[in-house]
Curated annotation (Swiss-Prot):
The gene coding this protein: FSHB
Domain of life, source organism: Eukaryota
Keywords: Disulfide bond, Glycoprotein, Hormone, Secreted, Signal
Entries under PROSITE patterns matching the protein: GLYCO_HORMONE_BETA_1, GLYCO_HORMONE_BETA_2
Recorded GO MF terms: follicle-stimulating hormone activity
Protein name: Follitropin subunit beta
UniProt keyword annotation of Disulfide bond present: yes
């Protein structure tokens, strides 16, 4: 019985403490306006949980900064979008996270909204494989 209790506590600890911010593979839809369709590519981005709290008493002298799982370092990769018209620029550059951390969301480079469009959104409605 003690083994079962230990296993249960270990699983709870693992779920709470170890689901930290880390690199994960995702599929995103990329689109070029000149090409009029989207393609899916695989990339690496940050996902996970960060310790945060929402204070009951909001102290205006001390801002409450919520930490999110975001990139610490990233690189850019470029792909050629196949099937574009010959006169169109068919190169697309996208970010690839190489290191993650829990930090303040930088709205200059990241969608910090509660509900963004999502990585598979395509404004043209047509996905090419």
């Amino acid at each position: 019985m003690k083994t079962l209790q230990f296993f249960f506590l270990f699983c709870c600890w693992k779920a709470i403490c170890c689901n930290s911010c880390e690199l994960t593979n995702i599929t995103i839809a990329i689109e070029k306006e000149e090409c009029r369709f989207c393609i899916s590519i695989n990339t690496t981005w940050c996902a996970g949980y960060c310790y945060t709290r929402d204070l009951v008493y909001k102290d205006p002298a001390r801002p409450n900064i919520q930490k999110t799982c975001t990139f610490k370092e990233l690189v850019y990769e470029t792909v050629r979008v196949p099937g574009c018209a010959h006169h169109a620029d068919s190169l697309y550059t996208y970010p690839v996270a190489t290191q993650c951390h829990c930090g303040k969301c930088d709205s200059d480079s990241t969608d910090c909204t509660v509900r963004g469009l999502g990585p598979s959104y395509c404004s043209f409605g047509e996905m090419k494989e």
